[in-house]
């Protein structure tokens, strides 16, 4: 109907859709001209990324997080601080990677739980640090007392009493589900974490989209936004090579070209005669830019400055002519001219 806005259905959460959203966000952050301009666009993009991750998280963990948001009452009363420790069953499952399961790739799983429960979730205790050498160095120091305890998950929240209890209850339920190992090959959460890690590292490949669609380079887009670039010719089309100028001049001659002297015609005093121009002798009828040395200006070295004058006075410029002396020129003296030799 006229006047009604068409509402498009949201795309289903999938790894391919999440990869496209992350690529668009990376593109926006890589272009300096777009940073801070489209504020609402960046906010909507972040909200869509969080929605897709949440739905994928729910589907992969079989209802790990309730799809309904927390229903919190109005904040009444003072702010309280609550904390809870959930110990990890490392003795029952010594080879299971609970820390990686709780934190996720680059801490995304823990951040997802924090955003949905409103609690702070941290892994503490022995073997909670990736660098074992650094863990041994910090053991016994102030603020590192938790390294003497068994591996556990620390959940903290700050809110009014009623709201804090609701948040803590939800967080404890979700973390307890993470502490139950899944069978090998049936851990959907692990599959999702590996997929997210591949997307973040740029190694994830979409199997449903054709290769030309995936051939999208962020570096090329950033370079195109900063300045012009050369456009390559389409495959199969090669530009013809530029033809060279023929060596013979074309067009009406403007001035005569000096031909080389002939040694056979020499005057008695040794001066060679000039060869008369022939009909085909001419010059090039074209612009001087094709032959850069044809009409080159006289070099300054051909005008030596006389240094005998006073400093600051005008110097006399003397033109230097490079006349070629004939190698077989005969010098005729007065006595030889009289005798005829």
Swiss-Prot record:
> From the record, which residues define motif Nuclear localization signal?
324-330
Q: Where in the cell is it found?
A: Cytoplasm; Nucleus
Among SUPFAM superfamilies, the record links this protein to:
Eukaryotic type KH-domain (KH-domain type I)
Query: Which GO biological process categories is it annotated with?
Result: 3'-UTR-mediated mRNA stabilization; mRNA transport; negative regulation of macrophage differentiation; regulation of astrocyte differentiation; regulation of mRNA splicing, via spliceosome; regulation of smoothened signaling pathway; regulation of translation; skeletal muscle tissue development
Location of motif SH3-binding in this chain is 276-279
**Taxonomy, superkingdom:** Eukaryota
Q: Where is the KH domain?
A: 87-153
* GO-annotated molecular function: mRNA 3'-UTR binding; mRNA binding; SH3 domain binding
Instruction: For this UniProt record, give its keywords in alphabetical order, as a comma-separated list.
Output: Cytoplasm, Developmental protein, Differentiation, mRNA processing, mRNA splicing, mRNA transport, Nucleus, RNA-binding, SH3-binding, Translation regulation, Transport
- Role: RNA reader protein, which recognizes and binds specific RNAs, thereby regulating RNA metabolic processes, such as pre-mRNA splicing, circular RNA (circRNA) formation, mRNA export, mRNA stability and/or translation. Involved in various cellular processes, such as mRNA storage into stress granules, apoptosis, interferon response, glial cell fate and development. Binds to the 5'-NACUAAY-N(1,20)-UAAY-3' RNA core sequence. Acts as a mRNA modification reader that specifically recognizes and binds mRNA transcripts modified by internal N(7)-methylguanine (m7G).
What is its quaternary makeup? Answer: Homodimer; does not require RNA to homodimerize.
Can you name this protein?
Protein quaking-A
**Originating species:** Danio rerio
Q: What is the lineage of its organism?
A: Eukaryota, Metazoa, Chordata, Craniata, Vertebrata
The gene name reads qkia
